[in-house]
C-alpha cells in the first residue's frame, strides 16, 4: 500500500510540501448523477422549477465549488485554476441529471479534488433547487474518471464502471 503523504512521522495531519515538484499541465474530470422522478426531471427539462434555471444555476455553483475547494477541504492546496467546465445532462434513463466536471491547471499538484468538489456542488445545487418538488432525490456515483499530469501520470476509470 502506498504511503499516505498527508501524515508526518508522528502521524499528525499536515499539508504536503509540493515546492520541489515540477509545474506541469494537469487535468481532472469527475462525474456523478442525481436521480429523481420523471415528473421532477420534467420540471428541469421544461424550465418550470420554482427556483428558476436549475441546470444554469447548478453549473455556476459547480464552478464556484471548484474555486473554493481549498477553503472546504483542509489539506488541499489553493491552486491557480485555469479552466472549470461543468456539464449537466438530463437523462431519462436514470431518470435524473448526469454531471461531469473538468478542471485544469498548470501547477505542482493535481486538481482531482477540485473536479470532485465541482461535480458534488453542482449535484447539491440541483437538489436544493428541486427539493420543494421532491425530497427523495438521490445523489450518487461521485468519482474521478480522468486524471492526467504530474509524476503519477495518467489515470482513466475503467470503461463500464459508471452507473
Curated annotation (Swiss-Prot):
Binding residues annotated for substrate, in chain numbering: 75-77, 113-114
Gene Ontology biological-process annotations: Mo-molybdopterin cofactor biosynthetic process
A GO MF term: cyclic pyranopterin monophosphate synthase activity
EC nos: 4.6.1.17
Keyword Lyase tagged: yes
Keyword terms of this UniProt record: Lyase, Molybdenum cofactor biosynthesis
Designated name of the protein: Cyclic pyranopterin monophosphate synthase
Native organism taxonomy: Bacteria, Pseudomonadati, Pseudomonadota, Alphaproteobacteria, Rhodobacterales
Amino acid at each position: 500500500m502506498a504511503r499516505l503523504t498527508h501524515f508526518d512521522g508522528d502521524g499528525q495531519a499536515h499539508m504536503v510540501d509540493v515546492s520541489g515538484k515540477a509545474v506541469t499541465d494537469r487535468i481532472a474530470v469527475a462525474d456523478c448523477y442525481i436521480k429523481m422522478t420523471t415528473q421532477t426531471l420534467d420540471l428541469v427539462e421544461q424550465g418550470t422549477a420554482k427556483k428558476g434555471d436549475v441546470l444554469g444555476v447548478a453549473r455556476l455553483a459547480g464552478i464556484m465549488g471548484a474555486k473554493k475547494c481549498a477553503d472546504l477541504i483542509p489539506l488541499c492546496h489553493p491552486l491557480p485554476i485555469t479552466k472549470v467546465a461543468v456539464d449537466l445532462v438530463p437523462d431519462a434513463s436514470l431518470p435524473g441529471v448526469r454531471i461531469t466536471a473538468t478542471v485544469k491547471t498548470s501547477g505542482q499538484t493535481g486538481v482531482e479534488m477540485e473536479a470532485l468538489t465541482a461535480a458534488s456542488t453542482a449535484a447539491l445545487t440541483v437538489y436544493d433547487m428541486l427539493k420543494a418538488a421532491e425530497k427523495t432525490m438521490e445523489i450518487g456515483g461521485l468519482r474521478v474518471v480522468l486524471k492526467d499530469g504530474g509524476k503519477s501520470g495518467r489515470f482513466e476509470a475503467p470503461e463500464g464502471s459508471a452507473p
